[in-house]
């Protein structure tokens, strides 16, 4: 059996968490990632019959029974993941009862998955119905995206439109726009359910005055979605107090979307 620490999915988690910490998106123990894995690939590294312990998930997910995820741990600092993955990450499988996680590897210090696991699993469930290839759900606190929450209306159309205006690539990268939730208590099933509802329509969901959720087929795609929003938010924050001389017109955004063949939110443009 291969060494689990050499598995591509473990390396991806280590590299991505380190990068997110480096960028200042995930201070202290902020942020979390869950990654849906292929059972056959995991079996190359772990005995799938060896369940270390079971942990209640806090909600029922019958659609995800048997699914295997690698998930960041609760209270864990992203800066420590790369040097100590076995304590900071865990590989779990949703048990047959749909409400329990079977720990197959990790959380070696007795810890468990992120407190936001309900929001992650509910989002996976929602995105898989829209896109069966969805694999990653990522939550972080990008500085400029969060700052923008305090000075811009938290309206999906208006916020998306502003972000699209900031960089030529934005309407191409996230043509489906950005969903928005008001401030809600984190770590609860309620915010998980609200996020999952938005995930039926958007791959990106702003948690008001808190951070952002992203979902995608790969780690790179998901990271890139959040990265692009953060760049747009940075440009907005750098320019919002200055006179606007130039902008990308709605007709030009439409040109971009149609040239690159993306399915964009036409109702978010003022044409």
Briefly describe each language-model feature range.
Residues 1-271:
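Glycine-rich flexible loops
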